[in-house]
């Protein structure tokens, strides 16, 4: 098999290069004779290596194994207590180490001082400000780079230049790290005080970031950007990323649009050859000049020069360099501040009395009216979700922290835990569960805090509120989100849209008489001035709503919600500062409530409307669109005359003045051609995304394993690559090797092969070919998949003990009783399983499962166990289909223009041939009639897996299922007896298959699968009416064609002659497909 195994073998020789080191390849085969040879081969290898004999002879003796069997893993052992990293590093440490400038950052601890200067004693030390939070070490990262450098030192031509650029940058890192010695990590991949005390505090996180950057260098420009960022981020740990990325908000306003894509009435992207000139007032250039000056003051030279050079003609062709700088700036790593500073940040804005009360009044009223509009239908019709809001809240209760650790009893087991779900169970068992009382968060019970770190911004604090707040808000917020789903203004929630739709919406109305106003309101969201009008607006809305109903339960739901707002208007937080816990009154809005996203969107919409209504007194314009997307809002205004420099300047100043009247510290800009918001930016009529995901530093530690993190690393690499930031693939593969290896003893280590890591089993980590998800159909692939399925789910004694306790059982049966009107095993078992799965976030349980998983894996990687599984996977289905397809060459012309310039060539090619899609394919069954029927009468939300299982049951079983969830018998009868039911079977199967094939992830989400251009390459004669079979045949064909085109840059045409006799067999099989969860699918999901 591919490149991975080759690199793995080279990597092992590089790492274990002493006399005593041995590599033993382990093979397997689905052919039983060959399998026996594999076993023999392995036994003899072990025998020889124990006796210190060479393995060379065996390799030739068993050439049949090496040729025809599949590599399963490589067992490597070495008796070297290897400090190899230090030894190898010296070779590269040949320049002057960097010296940190200790005066750059305002906060003392953000300067890169020697650790013992920042933390004189071990008690004071914390790694929380520099913790890379990833389960791989600096020494591994250094090894991976040195491996790459050694492997490529004899490259020629263009490749040699890349080698030299990277070598040059690595010398800087190596020299600096070498001066202090490589910090050794402990078993949890953390860096302790005695390791760090004589080293610069930020050494590790800086080195990780630098390695990530230097391994992403290809061109000379990359080299200049990386060098500057590597050198300066050693000292500047606070403002560098912000300085470098600030100019983008203005740059997008400088590029003329010459042809662009716009959204048409059918919500598709359509090319428009319109020309829109960038009208830029001098004031804007002055602001840009100021930004470039600030960059130079901070020591930047090359980056401001690149921007300056680009300004000469502001062309879209050279804009990719600007996009590159913008993306690179995030890779300097996370800015991690102390909690106290993060909290005080929002509190130090001084409060002025000099505000426009009239505007605040309007703002509050707009919030009030929007809340009413969102909820009035549900309230007037006494919606069941609002009646059973408490149950709905419990069913979707998360297993995150509840803010305090408590001692809990489950049967005979006593545990202490902070998890919400466990606290709820415990409270119910002990009669302390009172969802009708929202605990205060005042000075008597201040709120514990979480944190959110992100590159280029300050640390933000997050409220960890008691679970009562979640229960009180859940149902109401869900209703608000349903409203937002079919309201175009809410770009983030708008039904099944993706970012391309939002892009077409903006460009649609740009013309010579329009301007677009875009504002970053993140400062406003967390400002004190916002909190009173914001909460009051919501409270007033809830009061109006409460008068629209006579249903006591609905009124109670609204009142509890109102109570959360009242409590939060008087909030105090607890912040650890050294050994003391400080309580401060915190008068601002922070994330952590269920309503955070929805309510912020409402407030931001109200804010931009308030501002627009103000400036409409002075100008005459039509508002073509208003959008709010997270912390950003934007609006396109159309005037009756052509826009001039003076107009842009005046509107800009008036808008800023208007925001200032509300004391809103926001960055508001006006342009005629482009916008820049946190999620995306539009320049020259094209759409760009920031490729700013850090690979070798993480924001925080979770309870994911090394395997999970290897999959996340790969997934992050793919997203960055689609967005225009490419890291060397060999380096990424080397990291995957390191992170997926399993230590057996101190000197014994097992490295899984490519087949193990890329087959879609429960252990899948990456794709053997970027952007292409392959479903193996060869005998060996299916064999290994089965083998892994046999050991997929691991038991945990602690989890079993907890779920056997009365506390747990009573909780689950209480939920079932409240939910169900009659017995329903599927749902009861579902709830029990969901609750049991939530226990996984309790560390001892996940550790126990991990250990079991590792030991099962170790057995499997040394000798796969044949397991006759009767489970059918998507691979089996595709294996059945594959033989009936014949392939021939075809040609598709490139007919669409580029609109996403950062895409890799091969992905871009597909889009230019078949077009793109602006919607998400429905893959959760929510559009099916049965799902809608259930949500009409019950708060229960079945998953796509459950719907798939239910819809294939007998009709009377489906009726019972529905009736047990409270659906009236007449409705259940009508459903089962109607055509809709058979349409649902098809629709749910379709959703389920889309879900299995990850059609909304990676680069597949960009392609138009219903493109006529794609359809015409596929010929499948119609035989018999089995739509599900027709569907799977077509989808398989489309994926084959697209995958072939990604790989080869050319098109094929497929013809399928599927025998009618096989169709029924296939159809039956399609109702038994097992879905596989793997680190890979979790990483995809995590991207969402």
From Swiss-Prot:
Protein origin, superkingdom: Viruses
RdRp catalytic domain sequence ranges: 501-687
GO MF assignments: nucleotide binding; RNA binding; RNA-directed RNA polymerase activity
Transport as UniProt keyword: no
Cell compartments where the protein resides: Virion
One GO term (biological process): viral genome replication
Primary site of residence: virion
SUPFAM superfamilies membership: DNA/RNA polymerases
Manganese found in the keyword field: no
Self-association and partners: Interacts with VP3 (Potential). Interacts with VP2; this interaction activates VP1. Interacts with NSP5; this interaction is probably necessary for the formation of functional virus factories. Interacts with NSP2; this interaction is weak.
Annotated family: Belongs to the reoviridae RNA-directed RNA polymerase family.
Official protein name in the record: RNA-directed RNA polymerase
Organism expressing this protein natively: Rotavirus A (strain RVA/Human/Japan/S2/1980/G2P1B[4]) (RV-A)
